[in-house]
């Protein structure tokens, strides 16, 4: 069987979570001995990613290229489902939901328009997949988009290999945040929590990896309150592994995180984790309550208490080899293959 994955890919000028998902999932299907192709309208994309061919399309060439590839299954993200009309009639169409368009983050107009588009696409799909039960619930209950199955995401193969083989020791009292520096991500509440801890005689050091529009304001707050916070800006994958490895506690406070790939990254790095009580991460962190603090992310005092509790605990997350494997994309791809084989029953069987 041949699968085409439609969506963005990373380039020298573009990097995004969905692009990474597309490339890693494609490699996962290839590892499971499927024929796979990446199809994108990203300009200046490489001709291959992880050994998977990349076909670049535009409004003129899309029909010709997709017909040439003639995939049996086509999995699309974001607006790329518009190219389904060029697939052969019996191709299986899968739409993958990476989250939801909440008004507080995207604005009322974009949220309503994007959700309407996704509802229309979902009706044209044979299957709709989501990255968490939280994403599934929100899309179903608030946007009228029903999901067939949930598939948790993996980390990149590069990160997976590096983090399991690192020898960087943990730094006592070190906190790590990775992500955009915007209010929706809760970075301000983390810094306010650090002031609470400092005022209580329990100073912590924080490494902030990422950039965003709130950076200048956050830097001024840190300087004014003399907090031990290091703004790293955008960091390379290699450096990110180092910071995850040395961090004792990882903090991320977005209450509406659809999945939160940073949490599996932190878990594999054996970080203790402070996170909200809501979001997709709750589904796979609930089994680690001794090393995870679920907090009211809007309360700096609650965040500070979570950090303090974990900082005093000598316990680190213990992960089984089987559980670690679930964060590999060849495992994610195999789960999708098994799901489709069962749903195909006797009408069609999906084999390599």
Where are these regions (language model features)?
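Conserved acidic donor-binding segment of nucleotide-sugar-dependent glycosyltransferases
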Residues: 288-300, 307-313
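Nucleotide-activated donor-binding/catalytic signature segment of Leloir-type glycosyltransferases, i.e.
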Residues: 219-235
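Helix-loop-beta element that forms the nucleotide-linked donor phosphate-binding surface
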Residues: 136-155
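Short alpha-helical donor nucleotide-sugar binding micro-motif in glycosyltransferases
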Residues: 234-235, 242-247
């Amino acid at each position: 069987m041949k699968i085409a994955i439609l969506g963005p890919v990373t380039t020298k000028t573009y990097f995004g979570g969905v692009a990474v998902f597309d490339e890693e999932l494609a490699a996962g299907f290839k590892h499971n001995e499927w024929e796979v192709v990446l199809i994108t309208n990203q300009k200046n994309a490489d001709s291959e990613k992880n050994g998977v061919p990349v076909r670049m399309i535009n409004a003129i060439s899309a029909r010709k290229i997709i017909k040439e590839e003639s995939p049996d299954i086509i999995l699309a993200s974001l607006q790329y489902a518009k190219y389904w009309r060029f697939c052969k009639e019996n191709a299986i169409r899968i739409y993958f939901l990476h989250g939801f368009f909440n008004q507080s983050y995207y604005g009322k107009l974009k949220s309503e328009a994007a959700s309407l588009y996704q509802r229309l696409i979902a009706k044209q799909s044979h299957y709709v997949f989501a990255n968490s039960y939280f994403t599934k619930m929100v899309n179903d209950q608030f946007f009228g988009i029903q999901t067939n199955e949930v598939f948790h995401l993996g980390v990149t193969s590069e990160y997976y290999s590096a983090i399991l083989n690192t020898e960087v020791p943990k730094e006592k009292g070190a906190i790590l945040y990775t992500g955009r520096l915007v209010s929706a991500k809760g970075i301000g509440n983390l810094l306010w929590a650090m002031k609470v801890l400092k005022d209580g005689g329990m100073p912590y050091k924080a490494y902030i990896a990422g950039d965003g529009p709130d950076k200048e304001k956050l830097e001024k707050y840190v300087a004014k309150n003399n907090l031990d916070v290091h703004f790293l800006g955008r960091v390379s994958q290699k450096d990110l592994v180092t910071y995850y490895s040395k961090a004792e506690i990882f903090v991320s406070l977005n209450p509406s995180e659809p999945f939160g790939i940073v949490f599996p990254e932190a878990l594999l790095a054996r970080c203790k984790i402070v996170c909200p009580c809501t979001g997709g991460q709750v589904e796979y962190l609930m089994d680690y309550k001794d090393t995870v603090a679920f907090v009211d992310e809007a309360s700096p005092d609650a965040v500070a208490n979570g950090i303090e509790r974990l900082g005093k605990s000598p316990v680190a997350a213990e992960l089984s080899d089987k559980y670690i494997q679930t964060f590999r994309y060849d495992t994610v791809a195999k789960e999708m293959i098994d799901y489709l084989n069962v749903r195909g029953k006797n009408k069609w069987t999906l084999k390599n």
